[in-house]
Amino acid sequence: MKNKNRHLVKNVIGTLTIPVLVAVLLQGICMFNGKTMISNMTGFDNFVVYIAIVMITTIALSINLNSGRFDFSLGSMAALSSVLGAKITYSILGGGSNSALMMLILTILFGMLLGLVSGLMYVVLHLPPIITSLGVTLIYEGILFTITEGRYVMKEVQNPSMTAFTGSWIYAAIIIVVVLAVCIAIFDYTKFGYDYNCLLYTSPSPRDAHES
């Protein structure tokens, strides 16, 4: 039990070390120039929102990195699913009430679908992940460019209802908690997580991989 607690404390310290050091460094640079990193509530809202964006992207990327693979298509998946969700929502509700919720749900669904397509291409084609992900990236970016015609899509769909979701740190914090809870549940308490750990650690025994 003591070793487990010690390992937990070590992981927590290791996780917080880099963000804390970066925050101290950035604050020092800001203070040197007579500024502060977060000067008002709007700044704090934006800070938490972008923490959520970077954290979720990092979690998705690390799933492949841990198993020795690298997926270049994450950015194109996120961009395409977001644009599809925003444009469809705006075409149906015209920026009215519940636009943010509908856009969130559609974006998640499109993200899952695009991820499934990418995974199936890797499984069916039997090509190295770097080649598959680069191909998927080019395809998704081509579709994205065709839909938007190279224009900044937010100028078309931006309105108070659809942007209110990111206007407060509370929503971003909720998303962070939900994503962490879902990831812990999937990778620690499901058969998928069990199989993932077996592949990740390449132990002689699946039982050993799960316990490690």
Residue ranges and their predicted role:
Residues 4, 125, 129-190:
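Transmembrane helix-bundle core of multi-pass membrane transporters
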Residues 23-31, 40-93, 120-126:
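Single transmembrane alpha-helix segments in multi-pass membrane proteins
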Residues 6-11, 39-47, 162-172:
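Interfacial loop-to-helix junctions that mark the boundaries of transmembrane helices
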Residues 1-18, 25, 36:
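Transmembrane alpha-helical segments of polytopic membrane transport and secretion proteins
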Residues 94-137:
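Alpha-helical transmembrane segments within multi-pass membrane transporters and channels
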Residues 21-39, 67, 144-148, 183-193:
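Structural signal for alpha-helical transmembrane segments and their membrane-water exit/capping regions
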Residues 13-17, 47, 76, 101-109, ...:
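Hydrophobic alpha-helical transmembrane segments
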Residues 201-206:
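Conserved small/polar residues in nucleotide/adenosyl-binding loops
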